[in-house]
């Protein structure tokens, strides 16, 4: 896994429909929950939340820096229906660093160029985009590599 992804958060006092005022100020509301803890409403700067979501997705742990440090996985996001550059809400699931988690990790096709099958005019199709992986949060891979160099003829699989 690459470098640690961090997000500065603060506890959110504004609740309910009043969060519209936060959004207008460039703040994204959210929540952190997990086993053995009460759900905690949080907030963070909207640009940072979007950056973290683009980097981490739902398969990379994020270090939440607030009054307490927590490791969490992004569980759910609510995007704006009309804007692609902002999130209305984000939910984090707090995890323990010493307990395995299950996450869907993307599969990337890799190789040193075109496979023999592609040079023969065949098309390489990727049937799975993601696969479930069980690991400690800080050991989760960014992606799993599927080498295509060994594809030679029709029907070959990775």
What function would you assign to each model-found segment?
Residues 1-157:
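Extended basic (Lys/Arg/His-rich) segments that typically form rRNA-contacting surfaces
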């Amino acid at each position: 896994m690459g470098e640690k992804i961090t997000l500065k958060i603060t506890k959110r006092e504004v609740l309910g429909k009043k969060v519209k005022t936060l959004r207008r100020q460039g703040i994204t509301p959210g929540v952190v929950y997990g086993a053995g803890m009460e759900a905690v409403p949080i907030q963070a700067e909207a640009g940072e939340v979007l950056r973290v979501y683009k980097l981490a997705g739902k398969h990379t742990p994020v270090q939440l820096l607030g009054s307490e440090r927590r490791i969490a996985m992004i569980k759910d996001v609510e995007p704006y229906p009309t804007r692609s550059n902002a999130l209305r809400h984000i939910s984090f699931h707090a995890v323990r660093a010493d307990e395995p988690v299950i996450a869907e990790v993307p599969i990337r096709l890799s190789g040193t160029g075109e496979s023999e099958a592609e040079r023969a005019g065949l098309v390489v199709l990727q049937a799975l985009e993601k696969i479930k992986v069980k690991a400690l949060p800080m050991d989760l891979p960014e992606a799993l590599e599927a080498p295509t160099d060994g594809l030679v003829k029709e029907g070959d699989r990775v």
